[in-house]
Amino acid sequence: PKLISKIKFLAGHSLGEFSALVAADSISFEDSLNLVTQRAKFMQEAVPLGKGGIAAIIGLPLTIINDTCKKITTINNDLLVSPANLNSPNQTVISGTKKGIDLAINQLKEQGAKMAVSLPMSVPAHCSLMIEASEKFALLLENLNLKEPSIPIIQNVTAQNHYQVEEIKDNLSKHLYSPVKWLDTILLLKSQKIKTILECGPGKV
């Protein structure tokens, strides 16, 4: 209780946003399990297994990564790729079709990336390939018993804190095809004079 009373904001990276909502008493643990299960199902259905992917890019600014992805995507639909996780000034995750990811990795290495490597995930989260999945998820969210969070939630889509239930639901559906603005989230916390961040997660990512 003493720790909770000192918490000013909650945020979760990508899927972690659901953990933040549970911690804020906005949704129940049981509802969150159902949501993430259905969310994963919709996302996997949106892109055939082996056709999508993601990659981590280290050592290049977002402007170069964004421009490269845009140029690749204009070639044809099989080469769709875009920034997905905006993690830090020098670390971005890109998402899209496998062919688009492979081409982007090669081009970004040529432009000086310290590291450009595919990650072991077949679902290209946080890109436009997930729009159909987002529409299905939005229908599921309509009937969700979501409450106003007890602690402000900084959502990935906007990197702003939200209280309104309908805003939170809308952002959760957009979340599937929108980039995770994690750098902006950290900068917002800094602007609010937050000096201590408690990180909880199942792994080392």
Language model segments and positions:
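Helix-rich "cap/lid" substructures immediately adjacent to catalytic or cofactor-binding pockets
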Residues: P1-A11, L60, I94
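Alpha-helix C-terminal capping segments
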Residues: K2, L21-I27, Q192
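Glycine-rich beta-strand-to-loop/alpha-helix junction loops that act as flexible
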Residues: L15, T97, C200-P202
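Alpha/beta catalytic cores of group-transfer enzymes, especially the acyltransferase/condensing modules
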Residues: A24-S178
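Conserved catalytic block of serine-dependent lipid acyl chemistry
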Residues: K114, H126, K181-V205
